[in-house]
């Protein structure tokens, strides 16, 4: 399966039990900042934004004072899982990023999708990739 198929079929799909509800944007990004696959709506990000996210995975709390920036949008960092998941909130939407062995799985949402639904979609694929050694 191609990386783009993972984004299209496992991240940008309808959320279970909520037909028509899906993430706003999603991507799989290598830990070096290279985009492996993304939805057409995923924001163009700066290398330093991805570096900040990677630093927070290695040094939990790094982004808390400044917020998580992606594509010029600032998200307030909220509870995540140190070294594994970073979550951010902005208004009625937010972002979830799950670290795997080689990549980051990122999902961005807006209402009516809930933070929990975004977490479920992103973390399920991230856990699967971890199980596959990726």
UniProtKB/Swiss-Prot annotation:
<dbReference type="Pfam" id="PF00235">
    <property type="entry name" value="Profilin"/>
</dbReference>
<keyword id="KW-1015">Disulfide bond</keyword>
<feature type="disulfide bond">
    <location>
        <begin position="13"/>
        <end position="118"/>
    </location>
</feature>
<comment type="subunit">
    <text>Occurs in many kinds of cells as a complex with monomeric actin in a 1:1 ratio.</text>
</comment>
<dbReference type="GO" id="GO:0005938">
    <property type="term" value="C:cell cortex"/>
</dbReference>
<feature type="short sequence motif" description="Involved in PIP2 interaction">
    <location>
        <begin position="84"/>
        <end position="100"/>
    </location>
</feature>
<comment type="function">
    <text>Binds to actin and affects the structure of the cytoskeleton. At high concentrations, profilin prevents the polymerization of actin, whereas it enhances it at low concentrations.</text>
</comment>
<dbReference type="InterPro" id="IPR027310">
    <property type="entry name" value="Profilin_CS"/>
</dbReference>
<keyword id="KW-0020">Allergen</keyword>
<protein>
    <recommendedName>
        <fullName>Profilin-3</fullName>
    </recommendedName>
</protein>
<dbReference type="InterPro" id="IPR048278">
    <property type="entry name" value="PFN"/>
</dbReference>
<keyword id="KW-0009">Actin-binding</keyword>
<dbReference type="InterPro" id="IPR005455">
    <property type="entry name" value="PFN_euk"/>
</dbReference>
<keyword id="KW-0206">Cytoskeleton</keyword>
<dbReference type="GO" id="GO:0005856">
    <property type="term" value="C:cytoskeleton"/>
</dbReference>
<keyword id="KW-0963">Cytoplasm</keyword>
<dbReference type="InterPro" id="IPR036140">
    <property type="entry name" value="PFN_sf"/>
</dbReference>
<feature type="modified residue" description="Phosphothreonine">
    <location>
        <position position="114"/>
    </location>
</feature>
<keyword id="KW-0597">Phosphoprotein</keyword>
<dbReference type="GO" id="GO:0003785">
    <property type="term" value="F:actin monomer binding"/>
</dbReference>
<comment type="similarity">
    <text>Belongs to the profilin family.</text>
</comment>
């Amino acid at each position: 399966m191609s990386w783009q198929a993972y984004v299209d079929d496992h991240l940008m799909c309808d959320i279970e039990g909520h037909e028509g509800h899906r993430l706003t944007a999603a991507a799989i990004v290598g830990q070096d900042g290279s985009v492996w696959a993304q939805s057409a709506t995923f924001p163009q990000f700066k290398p330093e934004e991805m570096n900040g996210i990677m630093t927070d995975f290695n040094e939990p709390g790094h982004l808390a004072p400044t917020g998580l920036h992606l594509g010029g949008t600032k998200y307030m960092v909220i509870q995540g899982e140190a070294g594994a998941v970073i979550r951010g909130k902005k208004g009625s939407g937010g972002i979830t990023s799950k670290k795997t062995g080689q990549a980051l799985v990122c999902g961005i949402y807006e209402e009516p999708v809930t933070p929990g639904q975004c977490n479920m979609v992103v973390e399920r694929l991230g856990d699967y990739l971890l199980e596959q050694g990726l």
